[in-house]
């Protein structure tokens, strides 16, 4: 391995360690604004108290430089890798895994990762195929963008997939998303962000739903038809009355984001992925020389 590659791998490792902790401690400003707006919009006495408690929790985390939630989740990374970035993806993955482990040990953070059958804890939030990394490759570019989205179990357990048929149409999509959120109730710690993935294949629809929750709160899909669906779903979901923490109220979700892909003419896969109120995310941009810039959304 070249000296440049060694230095880059260490830079990625350091970025991953910092991103994981940053995401867990400091929620994004757009999320803070969404929670504040929710507090103003909520009319239920219980709902208002829940939202006030959530916002006070965030203030205490800021004051004490501590975690906003005890569930440190599974570390999920989204990587945009330039074609000319000098470090091979295998080295990037190795660094992301080592960075996650370093953050867990040095902070220390609660370790959640276990073997799926024995349930034995791996000890440092890493394990077989963990952390989870999603890749996107950019032709002609020499940089690397890394986004860390820690995902807790309460919200991840409320994930849904349905293979609709084309005849179900847009109304079928709406019915399924609405039914999913009603079934979830208060389990995913609402109000949060609902991610919807439409199209592709079964696995890709789930991927798109997860990608949707990683966007800044309230951003809209560039496709006007999809953006319209986001607005309609957002309104419908807040008519359920589930409310903050499932205790009733006006605000069930902070927003709904939809990502889509073209699909087979006889398919209509739809997936739902819920993100809890904490909606943690943090990003970094690395240059070919290892220089690193930390941003909320790289």
Regions found by a protein language model. Give the residues of each.
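Non-transmembrane, aqueous-exposed alpha-helical and coiled segments at domain scale
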Residues: 1-298
């Amino acid at each position: 391995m070249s000296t440049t590659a060694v230095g880059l791998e260490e830079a990625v490792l350091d970025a991953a360690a910092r991103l994981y902790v940053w995401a867990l401690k400091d929620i994004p400003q757009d999320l803070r604004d969404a929670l504040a707006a929710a507090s103003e919009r909520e009319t239920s006495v219980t709902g208002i108290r829940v939202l006030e408690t959530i916002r006070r929790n965030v203030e205490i985390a800021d004051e004490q430089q501590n975690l906003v939630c005890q569930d440190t989740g599974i570390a999920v990374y989204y990587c945009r890798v330039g074609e000319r970035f000098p470090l091979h993806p295998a080295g990037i993955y190795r660094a992301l895994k080592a960075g996650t482990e370093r953050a867990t040990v040095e902070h220390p953070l609660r370790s959640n990762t276990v073997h799926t059958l024995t349930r034995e804890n791996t000890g440092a939030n890493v394990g077989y195929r963990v952390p989870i990394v999603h890749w996107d490759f950019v032709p002609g570019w020499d940089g690397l963008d890394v986004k860390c989205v820690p995902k807790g179990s309460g919200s991840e357990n409320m994930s849904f997939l349905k293979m609709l048929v084309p005849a179900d149409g847009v109304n079928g999509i709406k019915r399924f998303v609405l039914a999913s959120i009603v079934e979830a109730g208060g389990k995913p710690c609402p109000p949060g962000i609902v991610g919807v993935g439409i199209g592709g294949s079964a696995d890709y629809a789930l991927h798109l739903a997860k990608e949707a929750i990683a966007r800044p709160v309230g951003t809209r899909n560039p496709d006007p038809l999809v953006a319209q669906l986001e607005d309609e779903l957002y309104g419908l979901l807040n008519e359920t009355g589930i409310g903050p923490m499932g205790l009733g109220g006006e605000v069930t979700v902070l927003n709904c984001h939809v990502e889509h892909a073209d699909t087979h003419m006889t398919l209509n896969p739809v997936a739902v992925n819920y993100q809890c109120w904490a909606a943690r995310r943090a990003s970094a941009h690395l240059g070919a020389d290892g220089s690193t810039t930390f941003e909320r959304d790289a």
